[in-house]
Regions:
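A conserved active-site cap/scaffold subdomain adjacent to cofactor or substrate pockets
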Residues: 2-28
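Short, solvent-exposed loop/turn segments at secondary-structure junctions
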Residues: 7-9, 28-29, 61, 140-142
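Amphipathic, non-transmembrane alpha-helical secondary structure
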Residues: 8, 12, 16, 31, ...
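Glycine-rich, proline-tolerant flexible connector loops at the mouths of alpha/beta enzymes
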Residues: 25-27, 137-148
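An alpha-helical appendage that flanks or caps ligand/catalytic pockets
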Residues: 30-131, 164-169
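Short glycine/threonine-rich loop-to-helix capping motif typified by GTGT followed
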Residues: 63-66, 144-154
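Alpha-helix-loop-beta-strand connector modules within alpha/beta enzyme cores
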Residues: 153-167
Length: 169
């Protein structure tokens, strides 16, 4: 797996070598790069289905309510989002009046809400790019382990079964 940026060259490199690109980006970038990956693979004689051999990364929270989702973002993710991720991205918002929880939601990398909302969001993602692989990230040091285990269990038992995933074999 190769962490892919918005660089088309990195996607072409992954396709050329059969590497799995890992998409840490908003959906529009994933869609663009997923199509490039398929096209480049086919130029090299490897028939690929959209999403095949590709990995989408998301930071999930499956919660009891939208308010609970906002709370978890603020308590478990905000510090790392602002102070760790921020320095890596020069375009990162520097306005001190920013509504950071809303900013995190709009970033496209966090996904969540109730089970039903999570299913809808993942179905929307998979309607555009049904990725063969998913990486789910929790800031484990900030999240109570019980929350992480419960959210992963909810994802595996309620969300994942609702996704239409092609048979990539």
């Amino acid at each position: 797996m190769v962490a892919a940026s918005k660089s088309v060259d990195s996607i072409r490199f992954c396709a050329k070598h059969g590497f799995i690109p890992v998409y840490f980006m908003q959906m529009d970038g994933i869609v663009k790069n997923a199509h490039i990956y398929v096209e480049e693979s086919e130029k090299l004689g490897r028939k690929m289905t959209l999403g095949q051999n590709q990995n989408i990364v998301r930071w999930p929270h499956i919660c009891e309510s939208e308010l609970d989702y906002d709370r978890k973002l603020a308590e478990y993710d905000l510090d790392i989002y602002k102070n760790f991720y921020g320095p890596f991205f020069p375009q990162f918002n520097q306005d001190p009046n920013t509504d950071w929880v809303q900013n995190m939601k709009e970033s496209g990398i966090f996904i969540g809400g109730t089970v039903e909302q999570s299913i809808e969001q993942w179905q929307e993602i998979y309607s555009k790019v049904p990725a063969e692989y998913i990486t789910l990230i929790w800031h484990y040091a900030q999240n109570p382990k019980e929350d992480v285990i419960e959210e992963l269990e909810l994802f595996m038992t309620h969300v994942l079964p609702k996704l239409e995933v092609p048979d990539f074999i």
